[in-house]
Amino acid sequence: MSELTTIARPYAKAAFDFAIEQNAVEKWANMLHFSSELIKDETMQTFLKSSLSASKLADTVISICGEQLDQYGQNLIRLMAENKRLEVLPAIYQAFQHYVEEHQKVAEVQVISAQPLNATQEQKIASAMEKRLARKVKLNCSLDSSLIAGVIIRTDDFVIDGSSRGQLSRLANELQL
């Protein structure tokens, strides 16, 4: 687990719990997404490394975000600036999204394939994973031609390696090559 994730998790959990309490999960997701995209900007990264005070940094970020932030979002920005944690906002957004998906009983599943999958193949994988995980799944598909053939399926809890590269690797280990 990265240091940023460790730092981000309590902020994300607090924001998520507050959003649930206020019935404003989508609003908070939008605020965090907008502010995290702003923080990822190269110009903003340089600005954050300047010697400005925390209140000046916070005021600038809040000013740029404008109406995208409500008073609670602004308070979060001020708190993060005071704690010198503004650069953690993208990780907070990711952790927040993870809490949302858990709350909605949605599991994120990464599917890495050697060749592009068609809609039928994606649907079969999604159905099988929904059955196995007992929750809805959100597939994130990507390509890796080094797999030769087949797929690798990853969730937070396990990995299924059905790739030719994985099979060859396991065979080589058994033969001790």
Curated annotation (Swiss-Prot):
GO MF annotation list: proton-transporting ATP synthase activity, rotational mechanism
One Gene Ontology CC term in the entry: proton-transporting ATP synthase complex
Record InterPro entries: ATP_synth_OSCP/delta_N_sf, ATPase_OSCP/dsu
Membrane topology: Peripheral membrane protein
Location(s) in or outside the cell: Cell inner membrane
Pfam families according to UniProt: OSCP
UniProt superkingdom: Bacteria
Keyword vocabulary terms for this entry: ATP synthesis, Cell inner membrane, Cell membrane, CF(1), Hydrogen ion transport, Ion transport, Membrane, Transport
Primary localisation category: membrane
Coiled-coil spans in chain: none
Family: Belongs to the ATPase delta chain family.
Function: F(1)F(0) ATP synthase produces ATP from ADP in the presence of a proton or sodium gradient. F-type ATPases consist of two structural domains, F(1) containing the extramembraneous catalytic core and F(0) containing the membrane proton channel, linked together by a central stalk and a peripheral stalk. During catalysis, ATP synthesis in the catalytic domain of F(1) is coupled via a rotary mechanism of the central stalk subunits to proton translocation.
Oligomer status and interactors: F-type ATPases have 2 components, F(1) - the catalytic core - and F(0) - the membrane proton channel. F(1) has five subunits: alpha(3), beta(3), gamma(1), delta(1), epsilon(1). F(0) has three main subunits: a(1), b(2) and c(10-14). The alpha and beta chains form an alternating ring which encloses part of the gamma chain. F(1) is attached to F(0) by a central stalk formed by the gamma and epsilon chains, while a peripheral stalk is formed by the delta and b chains.
PANTHER family: ATP SYNTHASE DELTA CHAIN
Name of the featured protein: ATP synthase subunit delta
Organism expressing this protein natively: Pasteurella multocida (strain Pm70)
